[in-house]
From Swiss-Prot:
Lineage: Eukaryota, Metazoa, Ecdysozoa, Arthropoda, Hexapoda
Record carries keyword Ion transport: no
Compositional bias ranges of the Basic and acidic residues kind: 146-162
Free-text function comment from the UniProt entry: Essential in the female germline for proper survival, sex determination and differentiation. Participates in the transcriptional activation of Otu. Does not regulate the expression of Ovo.
Keywords tagged on the record: Activator, Coiled coil, Nucleus, Transcription, Transcription regulation
Keyword Coiled coil (UniProt): yes
Molecular function via GO: chromatin binding
UniProt subcellular location: Nucleus
Organism: Drosophila melanogaster
Tissue localization of expression: Germ cells specific. Expressed in all germ cells. During the first instar larvae, it is expressed in all germ cells of both sexes. In third instar larvae, it decreases in male germ cells while it remains in female germ cells. In adult ovary, it is expressed in cells of the germarium, including the stem cells. In the early previtellogenic stages, it is highly expressed in the nurse cells. During vitellogenesis, it is not translocated into the maturing egg. In testes, it is only expressed during some steps of male germline differentiation.
Coiled-coil segments: 74-103, 147-167, 272-292
Entry GO terms, CC: chromatin; nucleus
Region Disordered, annotated ranges: 146-166, 227-248
Name of this protein: Protein stand still
Protein's GO biological process: female sex determination; female sex differentiation; germ-line sex determination; oogenesis; positive regulation of DNA-templated transcription
Length: 321
């Protein structure tokens, strides 16, 4: 029974974490309870005892730096050696883990996997590790998403074709001008001329504002029919067309003025206020961040000055005038 107790105590001793600064070269551990240790410095009188923790060894480093500054080189060498040892241990454990992963794993015999309609294996009931199961699940989800996207594309295509099939028959001499404010139907002239570029009785019709310069560049040159002598049988139709174009131009100008006034009122009411509020918030955040940085820099400079004064108590600043 005593042998078992001694063995368990030795195992606990081995499991205790001992930092490199307390390995016996600079400090000697006298007593350790958990993480708390009582040590003696190897370069101080033997009656001096220091207490600390193995998880926070900053006070031990500061003692060497303040009382035994000649040992800083040795402390640096010990630190480098401890880091190299830790690196070698990590690389060794990594190699062991890789060799364990490469070892063959016994897999039970699996039944024939059922194939879906598209030829992708979906039903896989094999005794595989959890990593393969997650990979299989990812493949399933990607396949399902791809299938849903294909179904949505085909549905959109069918809807568009059905809409095209259900469109009413529009005569060739009828044009539809679509605006953001109102829908205006205009009778076009025979011969392919556009109503947006035709002027009657010295009143030009404005082109569509939303179509852009590229649309205007693609249009043919404007034809002034007021200077062309009318053909027999077309005088009545041209007169009715001129009156309809006058009505269209008046309605178009009225709708344009209304939309411009509405947009200007909306711009004056809302966006300027939003922009100003956003600018105020941004400036407040910037000023707060600058203030915090100034305070941090001020405290750092005060700390540096106090540290220098502590390390050099007899220093007196004598400026050369």
């Amino acid at each position: 029974m005593s042998v078992n107790l001694d063995g368990s105590e030795e195992k606990m001793e081995l499991k205790k974490h001992v930092p490199y600064i307390l390995n016996g070269e600079l400090y000697r551990i006298e007593k350790q309870v958990g993480d708390n240790v009582t040590v003696k410095c190897c370069y101080c009188p033997p009656d001096r005892i220091y207490r600390g923790s193995v998880r926070s060894t900053g006070n031990f480093h500061m003692h060497i730096k303040r009382r035994h500054s000649s040992l800083l080189g040795k402390l640096h060498e010990m630190k480098v050696a401890a880091l190299e040892e830790r690196r070698d241990r990590i690389m060794k454990n990594r190699r062991f883990a890789k060799s364990r992963k490469k070892a063959p794993v016994a897999v039970a015999a699996t039944s024939t996997a059922a194939q879906s309609d598209s030829g992708v294996f979906v039903d896989m009931q094999a005794a595989v590790p959890s990593g393969n199961e997650s990979h299989e699940l990812k493949i399933k989800t990607v396949f399902q998403r791809h299938k849903q996207e294909q179904e949505g594309a085909t549905r959109k295509l069918e809807d568009s074709t059905s809409d095209k099939a259900n469109l009413p028959n529009i005569p060739k001499n009828l044009g539809i001008v679509v605006q953001n404010v109102s829908n205006i139907s205009v009778e076009t002239l025979p011969g392919g001329s556009t109503p947006a570029s035709v002027s009657f009785l010295g009143r030009p019709v404005k082109p569509e504002q939303g179509s852009g310069p590229s649309f205007l560049a693609d249009q043919p040159a404007a034809i002034d029919l007021s200077q062309v002598p009318p053909v027999q049988g077309e005088s009545k139709s041209s007169g009715s067309l001129a009156s309809s174009m006058e009505d269209v131009s008046m309605e178009y100008s009225r709708s344009q003025a209304l939309s411009q006034s509405l947009s200007m009122a909306h711009f004056l009411e809302h966006p300027q206020r939003d922009v100003l509020q956003r600018l105020e918030r941004s400036m407040a955040q910037i000023s707060q961040e600058l203030h915090c940085r100034n305070r941090i820099e001020h405290n750092r400079m005060l700390l540096e000055a106090a540290k220098f004064k502590f390390l050099n108590p007899n220093f007196q600043f004598e400026p050369n005038l």
